[in-house]
Amino acid sequence: MGKKTGPNPTDRAKGGVKRSRLTEARGIPVGLVLDGANRHEVKLVDSTLASLPPAAEAARDAHRAAGGEQGLCLGAGYDSKQVRETLTALGYTAHIRPRGEEVQAKKAGQKARRWVVERTHSWLNRFRHLLIRWAKKPENYLAMLHFACARITWYNCLFG
């Protein structure tokens, strides 16, 4: 495989890629970073937040100026002191469920917040070229990811 791949922790014989995404409340992708599949999520937080386009940063800043709180929902893999400190320094309120708490909340009838990101995973995996990585160069794969994200955004703006 090409660059930006690493040993897949679930399938030792193949290389894999990790797509770290930042989505808005409806699941529309606004930030994207690629790395090897063996890279831990905690190490991708800074680069994923830095991948926000200027328009999204302007909207975020306007929301904060109006007194709005900017929350960030993350999975249990992000539950670390380093991530919480980074998010606090950048002005985000972290919503990170510890491992096992999501099962308890499901029993209590609460809805999980991460389903929006999981839906975005599903939308991107509908593009066969992304589901099975054929591109050797990370630039080509990243370009296809950006194209798919643009198409998802366009579709949601028209029909969303």
Q: Could you say what each language-model-derived stretch is?
A:
Residues V45, G71, Q110, W123-L124:
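Preference for short coil/turn "hinge" residues that link or interrupt alpha-helices
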Residues K43-L44, A62, Q104, K137, ...:
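Flexible domain-boundary/linker segments
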Residues V103-G109:
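Short, charged, surface-exposed secondary-structure boundary motifs
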Residues M1-T93, P98-R99, A148:
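Polybasic low-complexity intrinsically disordered regions
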